[in-house]
Structure formats: structure tokens, C-alpha cells
Amino acid sequence: MGWIGVDWSSLTGFSTWIIAFLTVTLALLGKVELFVMHYQHSRKGNHMIKINHLTITQNKDLRDLVADLSMTIQDGEKVAIIGEEGNGKSTLLKTLMGDALPDFTVRGDIQSDHQSLAYIPQKLPEELKNRTLHDYFFLDSIDLDYSILYRLAEELHFDSDRFASDQKIGSLSGGESLKIQLIHELAKPFEILFLDEPSNDLDLETVDWLKSQIRKIRQTVIFISHDEDFLSETADTIVHLRLVKHRKKAETLVEHLDYDSYSDQRKANFIKQSQQAANDKRAYDKTMEKHRRVKQNVETALRATKDSTAGRLLAKKMKNVLSQEKRIEKAAQSMTKKPLEEEEIRLFFSDIQPLPTSKVLIQLEKENLSIDDRVLAQELQLTVRGQEKIGIIGPNGIGKSTLLAKLQQLLNDKKEISLGYMPQDYQQKLQLDLSPIAYLSKTGEKEELQKIQSHLASLNFSYPEMQHQIRSLSGGQQGKLLLLDLVLRKPNFLLLDEPTRNFSPTSQPQIRKLFATYPGGIITVSHDRRFLKEVCTSIYRLTENGLEVVDLEDLYS
């Protein structure tokens, strides 16, 4: 008996009716087996991941990043790993994938019967940068389902003719390179999907598409994200990696809750525990104050008495007082402790000399945006003034970063402008072989170094992390370095390319506040709805036909 696979969603109108009629007729006659094709690959049985007492220690500092993690991940769960920058999220993800990690010691047990996985890393792997699209999709991959591949390309508005091109993956925009990885990995047979910051470089429409895919697929998804909206709409289990006590103690929390419920529960528990700790402390202080008065009275009476019989009675009473003191101290050990919280980052601009509000810095009049001979957008019109905060959105590959580079060239020619720039690819500015202190230092003087260390500490860098090579830091920590560099340089105009892309939910509000209160002008490319709404005074969508004004409320429609 043969079989026919039908992707019903790709057919329309009369052709759908004809093929459906013929297929069902043949099936009834016993000539074919009929099945409906879904994006999900078929699997047999239930698959679980059992984690028992998993601890991951960084060898360089002998510091735990994951502490005694035990949990069972059921088939189909959507597990989000969250935590501050540098807390070990990517390390945990790679450990669950079975990767070898020579810089870490892993203790504990991970049991999994999964046979196939798909993985999209936080950064485009070096080995892919020089691969052509043709080789990636047709030579390197033998297990792709091409019906799914082309369907995904259509959904993501990626021209499938480009699959056969000789364009190198490294030449794609950040969003496009992430799109082709999504298409490639989701077209493979897999039982578990691992994603490391999947929404970082995607345009708003594609982020919404990815949310929907994660909710729909039957396979297990384990992912890292700093995007609170993304977390709220996808995760049903939270693994929270925390480093408390000045980043010296690891705490690993697991809750089988959606992100909003988890956040609400944590806030409620924090308030409840804080109140109980305060009540216990007041009761303890009151008991101890009463005890100290009794003890002081007995001591005074002992010193004053000259009667031996009274002295013996007082000595016996003092013995009882001291025994009671030990009981109080022992009981104090079971008092509710004040909850430990990771410290929020503290960073702000000072002594900025902004340009006049009305000063026109850039005037684009019907200009084209091009790369080599290829026109990305035409009829560009834009006026930029001294203290405006302009957000630019648009689909992946439309040329937003190219536009930012064009504006950077124009602003660099203005003598009155002190320009600060934060690229999407941090390595464009960072010197990876230097330590954070060495990178930020300009004079090497003691006073400057102390100031830098103080600033780094306010961004939750531990002292050892200040001494490590920048290449060993997480993406979020590298982003913090660029932010601090901007603050120390005191520019009066900023160009930002996806400035919030690697920062944790705890840091995000502080970063939005940092730029919202910045007195100078800003032009930023961003896909972060909250950032755009809280920071920008005007927003434009870049299209092939120019820049369109966007209403802030339309970002949520």
C-alpha cells in the first residue's frame, strides 16, 4: 500500500476540492494511506528530562552558577530559563543539551530519552558565517522536510528562491540570519527545541509569529529570554537562576507557572516574608530587651549583696537567666529571614550638555538608502533635531542598521555633536582580550580606576568579573560595558541599535529609565515595544518606500 501526504493549508479553491476528493476516494478504495501533514513531526511515546541535584561551578572563580537543581520536564512543556546577566543561563541550556563545557564542573544527573533536538544559539555561529544559503539548506542538511521548509519561508516572508543562492549567511542582517536558522531548525525532525534569546533580533511581526509557534508545537521547548512580553505569552514553567549576597551565592528556583503568575507570586512572597521577618525581629528585640533588663538587675544585685545566702540565690537566678538567653538565641535561629534579592543596576547620565531643542541636525529630503547597487528604501524624508528621541522599526532585512550607519556618518561631520554609539554587534566596539576595567580606563590613574570599579559594582559585576577578559562575559554583561562607556563619555547625542536586546527583566526598567531621562537626542533601532513606548517621542517604520510615522498605540495592535 502507498501513501500520500497532503499539506491542506497550501492548497486553495478548486484544486483543494479536486485533490481532497481524489485522495479520500483512493483511501476508501484501500489504495493509499491518508494522513494530514502538520508542522509538528510525529513522535512515539512520552519523553521526559529528569534532572537530579544538578550543580554547575565556574572553574575560574570556583563559583556556583546553578545550585542543586532538581526537576522533571514533561513532554511538551515550555520551560523558560530566566536570570540576571552572567548568571549562567546559556551554560545551563548547553548542559541540558549535553554539550561539553571545559570551563565548568558539572555535578549531578540528567536523564533524557530524547533522540533528536533543534537548537538556535544567541549569536550566529562562526562556522555559519561563511556558509552560503545554498550549502546550508541543500548540502549540509539531509534530514530537512522541504514541504515544511518552504511553508515556513512563506509564513516568515522570506523569499524561498534565496535558499539556492550563493549569498553568505554572515552578510545577512541579524534578523534575517535568525529567520533562516528558525526555518532550518523547525524543518528538521526534533523532539526538543532549545532557543537562546530567540526574540533578540526579530522584527515585531516575526516575534509574534514565534510566540504562536512555541504555543502550538507539541514538542518540549526550553528557552532563554529577557523579553517580558515574550515570556508572558509562551512559558508554562520558570527556572530562575539567581546570584545573591553580592553574586557569591547561587539560588536556583523552579515553579510550574506561567511568567506573570510567577512574577506575581514572587512579589507577594517577598512582601509576606519581609513583613514576617520584620515582625519576628521586633518580637525578638522586645524579648531581648526585657531579658537584658532582668539580667542587668540580677548582675547589679549580685555586685551589691554582702549576704552569702542571698548571693547564692542570685547566682542561681543568674544561671537561669543565662539558660534562658541560650534558649532565646536558639529560637532566633528559626526566625523568618529577610528575603535575599539581587540588586538592581544603578546607572544614570550626568553633566550632559544637550544641543538646543530646535537645532536641526539632519534633514533628509527624498533620499535613497542603498547597499552597493541595491536600493533598500527610497524617498526617505526625516528631520532630526537636537533633543528628539526617535525610534525606527521595520521588518528584518529592510535596512534599519544601514540607515543608522548613514545617520552616523552625517552626525560625525557635525563639530558641535559629541556622538555616542551602541551597535547591535557588541564586538564592533569591545576589545575582547581586555578586562572591563582596562577597556573603560583612559588614563590608568588610581582615582579613575576606583571610579570605574565603583560603576561596575553598581552594575552587579563581581570583583573577579571586573578582571576577566571581556570575551568570557555574557552578552548582557558586555552590553552593560557599552552602556557604562556611554555614561562615562558624556555624549550629547546617541545612536542605539537594539539597546535592550540582552538585558534581564530586572535590568530592563532601569535601562528604559536611563534613556528616557537622558537630556540629549536619541535615534534608536528597536523591536522592544516597552522601550519604544517609554523612551521615544516619535517612531518611524522603515519600508521600501520610505519612512512612515507610527502611532505609539499601533505598536500593540
Locations of the language-model features?
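ABC-family P-loop ATPase nucleotide-binding domains
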Residues: 115-177, 188, 424-485, 489-491
